[in-house]
């Protein structure tokens, strides 16, 4: 069910532009919990919030379909779906049931305004990939398991792998993929490509490590993630 979302981006004709590992002093469960919820994004991740709309972030909440219903975002999504389908590109979403052993999910989501890519200025970060002949103003998110995620603009893909290294250590590995014919310095600027997720993951590393210190404390008392938490 998620294959068609990945095939849209032509990863079979991609190459690794950059790879970085973020060693994190935190349990794998804390690390994954942090990655899969977005209540902390607005106060903690200015770079991510610069790229992604507030309506989407609040609607995402602590994971797909856990946040409050966003009428404004649903309007944007409906209009974008119609426009994108006219271009002949895939839209929609998929999610395993809550009792699935796989935790698979996929969705296509619009950016705000005239943004085309997950770059700071919203302009293309590289040449188009896969089946795209022109930019559709959206991106694709795919989860193949709790430990692996793909976040793909039309022009580059960011692949996340979470690797437990011990009870209190987790490696967060990120690969940035571009079209196999793309040339660094000509078709893409590496710093522009990695900007958002590099900044965001460095901030997440600190958050996770602080959470781990709290969990290890005898005085730790868990609380809600947000006043919006349902």
Regions found by a protein language model. Give the residues of each.
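C-terminal catalytic domain of Rieske-type non-heme iron oxygenases
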Residues: 1-230
């Amino acid at each position: 069910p998620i294959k068609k979302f990945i095939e849209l981006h032509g990863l079979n004709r991609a190459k690794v532009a950059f790879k970085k590992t973020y060693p994190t002093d935190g349990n794998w469960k804390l690390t994954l919990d942090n990655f899969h919820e977005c209540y902390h994004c607005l106060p903690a991740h200015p770079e991510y919030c610069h790229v992604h709309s507030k309506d989407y972030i609040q609607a995402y909440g602590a994971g797909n379909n856990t946040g409050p219903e966003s009428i404004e975002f649903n309007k944007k999504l409906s209009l974008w779906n119609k426009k994108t389908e006219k271009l002949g590109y895939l839209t929609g979403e998929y999610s395993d049931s809550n009792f699935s052993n796989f935790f698979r999910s996929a969705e296509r989501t619009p950016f705000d305004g005239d943004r085309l890519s997950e770059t700071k200025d919203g302009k293309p970060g590289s040449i188009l990939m896969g089946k795209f002949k022109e930019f559709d103003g959206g991106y694709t998110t795919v989860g193949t398991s709790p430990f692996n995620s793909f976040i793909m603009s039309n022009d580059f893909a960011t692949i996340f792998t979470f690797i437990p290294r011990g009870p209190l250590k987790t490696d967060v590995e990120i690969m940035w993929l571009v079209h196999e014919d793309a040339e660094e310095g000509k078709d893409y600027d590496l710093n522009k490509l990695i900007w958002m997720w590099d900044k965001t993951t460095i901030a997440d590393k600190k958050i996770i490590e602080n959470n781990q210190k709290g969990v290890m404390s005898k005085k730790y008392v868990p609380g809600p993630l947000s006043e919006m938490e349902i």
